[in-house]
Amino acid sequence: MKALLRRLLLVCFVLGALVAGACASGPAVVDHAFGFDARVDSPGIEILNFRYGASGMPGTSGDVGIRQFGRSPQVTGINGPMPLGDTLYVTWRIKATGQEFEDTVNLKSRLPSDMANQRIHFSVKESQLFVYVIDPVPRPADWPVVGPRKFQYEKVRQIYPDAPGTPPNHSRNHSAS
């Protein structure tokens, strides 16, 4: 009887380890932040939708706001342990012209290897999406001021586009009529 109980416990342990290993094969869970504030950082722009990664966590996509209120939120911020996103998808409209744009950024090769306590933040200027990684440490005097004004005292790296002067991205050529 004891041998049977031991075998049963061993089988349960092995199955539990296999299930735990299968669950761990998804994206790394890292304590970091994601957000944007179109009202302040992107005047004249309406965010139509966005999606950071594929976790579906609240604040990582505009889907819930669109379903509940008929439009995407214009500001969001989420902090804490969450899956590290592989991509950032954003669609937006220039309010003055009605022209719509979309862009998908592959974040895998752009993010630093250690994203703990870092913030991913995006803004839009006309037809160009900008993505930043904000390190919450004070910006050294010799570090350039980059990105949204509210982060001017922190170390900010622009990770997209690669360099100034990158051509505009993926116009959907829609206009308000």
Where in the sequence are the language-model features?
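Bacterial N-terminal signal peptides that target proteins for export
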Residues: 1-12
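Bacterial N-terminal signal peptides
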Residues: 11-20
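Post-signal peptide N-terminal segment of mature Sec-exported envelope proteins
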Residues: 30-46
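Tryptophan-paired
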Residues: 48-97
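Edge beta-strands of extracellular beta-sandwich domains
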Residues: 100-106
